[in-house]
Amino acid sequence: MTAAILIFVTCILPGQVVLQAQDPDSRPSESKWPTHGWAKAKPSSVGLDEKALAAFDADLASGKYSLVDSFAVIRCGNSVFEKAYSHDYGTIYAKEAKMRGPLNAHLTGPYNYFDPAWHPYYHGTDLHSMQSVSKTVSSAILGIAITRDDFKAGLDTPLLTYFDVAKVKNGDDRKRRITLRHVLTMTTGLDWNEEIAYDDPKNDASLMEATDDWVQYVIDRPMAHEPGRVFNYSSGVSELLAYIFQKETGQDIEKYGEKYLFTPLGIKHYWKRTPMGVVDTEGGLFLNTTDLAKIGYLYLHDGIWDRKQIVSQDWVRQSLTPFTDAEEGFKYGFKWWLLPRTDRPGYIWMARGFGGQRLMVFPEENLVAVFTGWEILKDETPDRDLVNRLLPAVRTQTCAAAP
């Protein structure tokens, strides 16, 4: 994921990536920053193949790529394609909505994933469940707090600093060695099974959401590995971010994000909370499609928005560094998925969520793509299949019109 605004260069040390700073003159003019809405342009005017996008749109509408709710493409600061696809989820999941199970431990409310009042859209609005894209946005808010020196602890601070150790089960020396860095990179070593389907009663994420105290459920898990050695995807570990943020800063992560991220970028949102009132940083955020694109655009511009440094370039660089091998051929940074490119060195940056939520950033093409969906009982479309439909639509490496 050369005429980019932001270029992902080669690794110069194991795990370290250098980002080439963008030329300030190449950034959008103030009038084009999409705080209050994206400027519109035809795909061909920014070097995209309109027929290729139209064919992809037709396949999305046909259901070839599962239950997709929306698709948007941003290139060179312009919205060149936005489309919503309608599905009657009340009918599609009517049977499941009436049966108690791992995805609807409560027959109504925010943690029944078949309740059409809550999923995929929040109470009839255009705010769509982001699921695990929430993790990536939470990482951005943490980065802002570090940038502003409101979060003072270093990333090598032990996780148990924020807990009464006497009340933590399964304590051993390995658990004492878990740090905030391990939380960000999914390498805590905690025993956690989220590889099986979410409607499987043995899935730890579903088990956690059926409890009242999610944070306690997570921190009480036994250890399976030495911290820092094994990537193990864990929604529970990501839920700890909200708790840690409150303990370290004395502030609520949603309210902080409202002030320093959502408002400056012009993003409207809703964020679910756990039964204990903790912000659901593992999967509870709701955004609309084009507002989600703003998160990718912020990172595409080194954390700068409308000529203001919202999150430091250093945090952006670290977030997009491939610290560990992950699943499905991905690398993993600070809550960002990094898909190795097959056509050149570098990565496509992604935020990924259950049901088909995808934020994709192609830095070398100056392109951001967003998908939302609600395919929650079947396998989602592989990310490379979507990438392989998007990249052929790019006709020019610059923002020049397609020939």
Protein language model annotation of sequence segments:
Residues 83, 93-118, 156-160, 199-226, ...:
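Short, charged, amphipathic alpha-helices and their helix-cap/turn boundaries
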Residues 268-269, 316-368:
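Active-site Gly/Thr loop motif
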Residues 351-403:
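Structured C-terminal helix/loop/strand segments within mature extracytoplasmic catalytic/sensor domains
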Residues 118-120, 124, 129, 147-190, ...:
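Active-site helix/loop module of the DD-peptidase/beta-lactamase fold
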Residues 61-121, 366-370:
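A short, well-structured edge-of-sheet supersecondary motif
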